[in-house]
Amino acid sequence: MCIRDSNKVVGEWLAKQGYDYIRPEFTYGKSRIDFYMEKGEQKYLLEVKGCTLEVDGIGYFPDAPTERGVKHLHELAQAQQAGYRCAVAFVIQMEGITEVRPNVSTQPEFGTALAEAKAAGVRVLFLLCRVGRDSLEIVEQREG
């Protein structure tokens, strides 16, 4: 599975969540956020992160340094303060994993940015998946 698979499966999942409007690849600030949605008058931003690293039954992100991921978290925190409802969704691409933690040994800045985003009101979602040889399906959502 790759990042495109994560975004595709989240797009399919979002279509079932009752939004009035969904737009992928939305520019906010200096970033391209994975999804912009509307429900009534409320505006939402969602950034998707695919989690494929597991250590002792826990998912970790990122598996390699991602300056872009840090930047996206800062943009989401700013958007949350500007009135958007924002979330980062970790698509867990391994069965049996129910949470994702920041991989601070690989990139401590991501852990700091995630904590700051949460403090600003950005929701953290864990999207648990059923993984097949050629398929990926979201089967459960948990809050982080």
Roles of regions detected by a PLM:
Residues 57-67, 77-106, 128:
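Nucleic-acid nuclease catalytic cores
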Residues 26-29, 33, 66:
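Charge/polar-rich, low-complexity and marginally structured segments
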Residues 13-28:
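A short acidic/basic microdomain associated with nuclease active sites
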Residues 70-78, 109-113:
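A short, acidic, amphipathic alpha-helical segment used as a generic capping/interface helix at domain edges
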Residues 1-6:
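Conserved small/polar residues in nucleotide/adenosyl-binding loops
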Residues 26, 37-39, 48-50, 90-92, ...:
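Short, structured patches in soluble enzyme cores that scaffold and shape functional sites
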Residues 93-144:
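Domain-level recognition of nuclease-like catalytic cores that cleave nucleotide substrates
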Residues 35-63, 76:
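Conserved catalytic cores of phosphodiester-cleaving nucleases, focusing on short active-site segments
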